[in-house]
């Protein structure tokens, strides 16, 4: 079997590795560097990738960087009159990595394992896979960056049971994953993150500071000058790196622009203390996901045996100090933050080819998946942090008599109401035979494959007819949306709870009306007409209340109707008992049906444990 290369397709830098002699090795690029800037430039119809494109960015406006931030969206870059999608730009980077890997190996490479941030959603993962396909690579597996890092770290430690926390702060994304290592099994317990936080944001803080200082001294806004801005960007990145090793750095940019009196130069001394002050809020944003990952794994900081740092931004002293303070231990320094992810991807490639044995990788899905059910509620089928690959089925029913079709609205997110979550796709199961509500059995199945990509299927168990969809949303979730989901879930917990209670109240009331209609038909001629009219009046009042949004009134009318129907049932059984006693007293009456039980609008059947929910 041909070799499978491991690729870390990063926001700022990318790397490629291969398994040789049982060890993962980084493949250097043609310039001799072990990582390649994720930068693409277009000039006179020619494409430039990596360091060459990055160096030319100052004079070439047709230069694209940090395209990974737009994966899974409809974003387009227009270059020389042509639109490029994020997948196409990423494919150009992948093609370059593929070409120099082939030169190094002396053979054609057509298979790869590509890493993505753990918090990437379905659309972003699909976009990454598509980029690989465009680049001429068969993507054997999409794996999470922290998981790949753990694989590289733990390959020679498979005999020791330990719990590790991977802290991954890259150029554009931030992830925290907690894994358990032991007996060759790498099991992810939880993952959390922020897809809008990375080294680029630290650079921007320095750029904004330099722009403000220059404007204060010279009255000129450099942010309006594209060439000056590119020079500032390069200088900010260099200053950030310098301040990881020294406490002060000099930023010197001669001839940055020109004023009325002639050329102007930028000279600023940036201290580590000032840098820490500028970026304090960014460092603080790493704390909440870290705590969330621990909480989801049901662990405390003291349960963590090792902390692994991934991504160049983890070299920032303030970041390391925050980790140490939060987790109470020094981070492990035995792995290279820039290379460890690609190496882990190469090891996963070795697992697939069979070159690496006795290693099992168990990853998780970062966000909950479900469908919209009556009342606008999201019914979750697969909870976040569920080990993948996985599949889950539940059985639902129709909400109306003779309903000919059901719409399946597939959702991803943590909020209880459907409207507050992200739509992954919609499809319809049609041609359901006419039947009363609640009779048809519609089985909805979710499958998440080893790459974290979702397939949803709906099947009418009565007819065997089915429909399915592979989620290939072109827009996907933006970084902002995915971060907003979890934050909104926490900030709006009370409102969510109230909305869900109201939806359930409305559903229960609607079900009660349906049950009462059925009961009144059964009682026809068996109880006094006046009692029936009383029940019908209460039912009509509840139906009227259901047209509005006064949930207190709906609750009151529901309780009132419930009480009337219960009394009717009691009288019916008392009457039947009296008749039997008069006729000689037949014993062994069936237990009365409890019409006080109010079901939801659908029936769920959990295939895993065969229990009704």
Curated annotation (Swiss-Prot):
Alphabetical UniProt keywords: ATP-binding, Chaperone, Nucleotide-binding, Phosphoprotein, Stress response
Reported function: Acts as a chaperone.
Induction behaviour: By stress conditions e.g. heat shock.
Keyword Zinc: no
Gene coding for it: dnaK
GO biological process, one term: chaperone cofactor-dependent protein refolding
Protein name: Chaperone protein DnaK
Residue positions, PTM Phosphothreonine: 173
Lineage: superkingdom: Bacteria
CDD domains registered for this protein in UniProt: ASKHA_NBD_HSP70_DnaK-like
Region (Disordered): 578-613
Feature: compositional bias, Acidic residues: 596-613
Keyword Coiled coil assigned: no
Biased composition (Low complexity): 578-591
Single GO MF annotation: unfolded protein binding
InterPro entries hit by this protein: ATPase_NBD, Chaperone_DnaK, Heat_shock_70_CS, HSP70_C_sf, HSP70_peptide-bd_sf, Hsp_70_fam
Family: Belongs to the heat shock protein 70 family.
